Amino acid sequence: MSKDTEAKSEEIMESKVLWYPDSKRNTQTDRFRTLVNREFGLNLANYNDLYQWSVDSYPEFWAQVWKFCGITCSKMYEEVVDVSKRISDVPEWFKGSRLNYAENLLKHKDQDKVALYAASEAKEEIVKVTFGELRRDVALFAAAMRKMGIKIGDRVVGYLPNGVHAVEAMLAAASIGAIWSSTSPDFGVNGVLDRISQIQPKLIFSVAAVVYNGKQHDHMEKLQNVVKGLPDLKKVVVIPYVRSRQETDLSKIPNSVFLEDFLATGKEGDQDPQLEFEQLPFSHPLFIMYSSGTTGAPKCMVHSAGGTLIQHLKEHILHGNMTFNDVIIYYTTTGWMMWNWLISSLAVGASVVLYDGSPLVPSANVLWDLVDRLGITIFGTGAKWLAVLEERDQKPASTHSLQTLHTLLSTGSPLKPQSYEYVYSCIKNNVLLGSISGGTDIISCFMGQNMTVPVYRGEIQARNLGMAVESWSCEGKPVWGESGELVCLKPIPCQPTHFWNDENGSKYHKAYFSTFPGVWAHGDYCKINPKTGGVVMLGRSDGTLNPNGVRFGSSEIYNIVEAFDEVSDSLCVPQYNSDGEERVILFLKMGPNKSFSQELVGKIRGAIRVALSARHVPALILETKDIPYTISGKKVEVAVKQVIAGKEVTQRGAFSNPDSLDLYKNLPELQNF
């Protein structure tokens, strides 16, 4: 190990503890560990022991999760998984079992308990839906779908905001065995068609208009253009949503019908239809999810009903310590995998809060108001939003009670170390801050929140149970306390069963198994702390920087740069010359009323040199007016890398601010390298 690396490894080991677990050790993870010890005659003393057993004995582990989390099935499995198969073989899980995802979310005996709270920027009123009402509505949706000919394997799409109708339509599709896919109304026509035209849906649900940032936005023109690009559609169901039916003209959209009229076709006389759950294999497709599509057509990942269910139950119950008494919100749209993850909380019997609108309108308190109003216990958001609150000097701890809140989750991008301090000083000092990380590729997390181990500043607490995750060097060797590629060594039930339109599996293989044969390479760069077991995410592998043979992740730079008050955001990318030499370019977006200066550049260079090393200091530091983000709030380094190399980025539908890419074209400072 070099002196430089040794120093960094020491530094990572000395993280500050911000939260300690309850000494009573009576979490669901502790109870699960006790059961495993009893069942297998083991003496697993703590989370680390349990984690090691879960990856060494993964078939036994997943069988115990099935039992502990109470999965409902009509036929029990014959085999958990074939242990002779590698993760790259995409083995079948729980062969022989028959179940239904929707049934597992709607099985609760207390039909009067609130399943969904729906709040929106558009209305003061919060809509409540009990489990009994949700079952009744899903039955009606499903009956209408069956009536129009939707059957097992057909694709049903929601181009919908995060509200009750999206949940009902998704559960109805799942009850039949149809495959659900969704995207949010903030996606433009091209962004939607790049995704859903690939899967040839028969049915689409959408809305007439939405409200965001205090304004009503018409959605009909976009919907009309989307429908034109989907020749296999049999029906378009329109929900007036924030408009009245009278104000909505369906005449330009073929095969369109209002939701009310569509649901009426599911009724037989005055009788409410019975809810029937098709009993399907564990590996039956449930969701089609999409890669970001920032560098090419989005990949269509097919996720199984059983794999999604068991993985989400594991994360909610064992990692989140969730029970039926919890009330959870995740600030998300239907176009992000966190929506699917959130809705699976219904399987635990928890109440789910759906919010549609801006998290900053009418004020930055809107979501904290909901915490106090609804008694929210688990609150999830993107790391970027927490940074924005800190920038605005928001202090929810002094304006809100937040008494019920026990867990605050963050994902979407690496959570900066200073955001940890902000949460504990300005939001709540005894909350579990769970930075969670995984991806759409597994519709879940590799590492995340954990009620049994401490929270260290700047670190994700631990690798999740059953996820054989390591950080590997380019040579394919595990590294500890050093930067490396995030890999998963053993099969997991939540990996996609396949990609849509990938007959021979070549796209799937290229996406995950072309870097290290037989091992899943996730495309993230990370560092695992050998002392704490915590993980630091360092950005996407395609955003990895390697000037002068020093390999590091862009987040290492962001954590330093964005601690400067003058800097509101930053972007760090490599530039290559014709000989293949690399230099690092750092772009700074200045904060309000702050100006870019050579004095600031000097300070930033000095801070990077001290915190990392002289070899981490960017070759050039330039000002930019904007930084490109995807619609789900992820910074897009790889697209800027392409632009500064003189390449055109054609897939602009995935960006929330596509015009920002033009700011990086033909920059004089980047010529003649």
Curated annotation (Swiss-Prot):
Catalytic reactions on record: acetoacetate + ATP + CoA = acetoacetyl-CoA + AMP + diphosphate
Keywords: ATP-binding, Cytoplasm, Fatty acid metabolism, Ligase, Lipid metabolism, Nucleotide-binding
GO molecular-function term, one example from the UniProt record: ATP binding
Domain of life: Eukaryota
Record-listed E.C. numbers: 6.2.1.16
Family matches, as InterPro entries: Acac_CoA_synth, ACAS_N, AMP-bd_C_sf, AMP-binding_CS, AMP-dep_synth/lig_dom, ANL_N_sf
GO biological process: fatty acid metabolic process; positive regulation of insulin secretion
Location in or out of the cell: Cytoplasm, Cytosol
Gene Ontology CC terms: cytosol
Keyword tRNA processing: no
Role description: Converts acetoacetate to acetoacetyl-CoA in the cytosol. Ketone body-utilizing enzyme, responsible for the synthesis of cholesterol and fatty acids.
Similarity annotation: Belongs to the ATP-dependent AMP-binding enzyme family.
Name of the featured protein: Acetoacetyl-CoA synthetase
Organism encoding this protein: Danio rerio
Taxonomic path: Eukaryota, Metazoa, Chordata, Craniata, Vertebrata
Gene: aacs
